[in-house]
Amino acid sequence: GGEASSFTNLLNYVIEQDYDSEDIIYFVEDDYAHRYGWVDILREGVNQIGADYYTLYDHPDKYYLPMYEDLQSKIIATDSIHWRTTPSTTCTFACKFKTLKKYIDIHLEFCKGDYTRDHNMFTHLWQQGSNLISCVPGYSTHVEANMLSPLTDWEKLCK
């Protein structure tokens, strides 16, 4: 059992489906909340940017951890929001089916053990030439109090 085993089973299930290569696959962990309009924002990013991976979670660790002190991001504007390149996210992310198929072995490799090593997985994917973008401000958040995506009153929004 465990989170990594569940995510591995999900990855294997999805990869066996007969989706179109351009279909958007969105993986969502069970401890995330989303702002209204998140579907439109995700589609906007996919349709206007063309990155490999997308996250609606503006992870707060990028703002305070010493390891990100010198982090440089490319800022991209779409019709209604800004996006930035980011080196990692959690297992709540989107990609096109063709991207998942291309990198499935990497996803599965980082699911070995009790927990998915999501940070290491995305930094490894980055090293392999893929990219990840995050909308700013975030349209989703981890619901742990110290992991909330900044600039949104999530407590008010989730009541």
Task: Give the location of each predicted region.
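C-terminal catalytic/acceptor-binding lobe
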Residues: 97-98, 102-159
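Short, high-confidence coil segments that cap the C-terminus of an alpha-helix
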Residues: 20-22, 50-51, 129-130
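Conserved residues at the C-terminal ends of beta-strands
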Residues: 28, 56-57, 138
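Conserved catalytic core of nucleotide-sugar-dependent glycosyltransferases
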Residues: 33-107
